[in-house]
Amino acid sequence: MMRPREAFDQRLLSARLDIHPHPSELRWLHDVFGNSVAIALFDKRTSHLTVTSETVLEHAPLSQGQVDVEAYARLFPFTYSSEDMPDLLRSIERQHHDPERLVDNWARAFVRNGGDTETIALLTAMATSIKRDFTYVPRHEKGTQSPIETLKKRQGTCRDFAVLMIEAVRALGFAARFVSGYVYNPSRSEGVVGGGNTHAWVRIFLPGSGWVEFDPTNGIIGNRGLIRVAVARDPVQALPLSGTWFGRPASFLGMDVTVDVSRADPARFPRSNHGAINSRSAGSSGK
């Protein structure tokens, strides 16, 4: 899964996938979440495998101020509509055991006592608190920490932080999904981490705005600088690269991953106004 998803806020202008050695068979499919998956088969022996994906896309950023929530969902708690709930249930379902209710208690700390809790304020506070109170530590081993382990260690990768926030908001009744993709980091001085590798964050379903991005690693609300590649209910369903091989265990020496996200030359790729950006006017009418 390396091909970015097509959507109103990101449109593919060009995409190329190079695999060396050349596979004997290459086919594409959409998985159950609509992610683009390339399946490559090989019929010859090789000492190495290189997969290179190059993409140019048009990105329409959405900021926190452009997230508009339906009136009934602006305060927490709320209940999803009867039309949406059947399709959201699996995204609300908890994935990790929490016998001591550590995740539950941590999530509940963001709910105001004795006053109204705004939905966006709650989710924003949770995302920004992870960026502020937890330490980002790169880890190249596969898999994620459990949310409880991340809470206790107060450190982890972008995947760990995403899983923690997903489990926490699900404990509050929100529908949430795991996102794998890339983050645009033009300057390290801007404090954005997760560049140079695949990145992970969260999508939460909010009535009135649909699936909204929350990046707890960087405290980003909205899709600014975030390029979606795969969306799934669980991280294991959104692996960028997976497969099987035949050989001696000692033959596998490791894997290197490099991601480079840069701004395209506007002269070669002029804006098409395809990206849909939310806007609001003071006075408007329609029939």
Show the residue positions of the predicted features.
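Generic beta-strand structural signal
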Residues: S47-V51, T124, A200
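Hydrophobic/aromatic-rich core segments of domains that either
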Residues: N113, T128, D160-P249
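A structural signal for short, well-ordered beta-strand segments
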Residues: S53-T55, V202, V257-V259
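Beta-strand-rich, non-transmembrane domain signature
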Residues: M1-F33, Q237-G247, A267-G286
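Short intrinsically disordered coil segments
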Residues: A15-L17, Q66-F76, P216-I221, T244-F246, ...
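Intrinsically disordered, low-complexity N-terminal segments that are enriched in acidic
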Residues: M1-T79
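Secondary-structure boundary elements
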Residues: R74-G156, L164, L172, R233-P235, ...
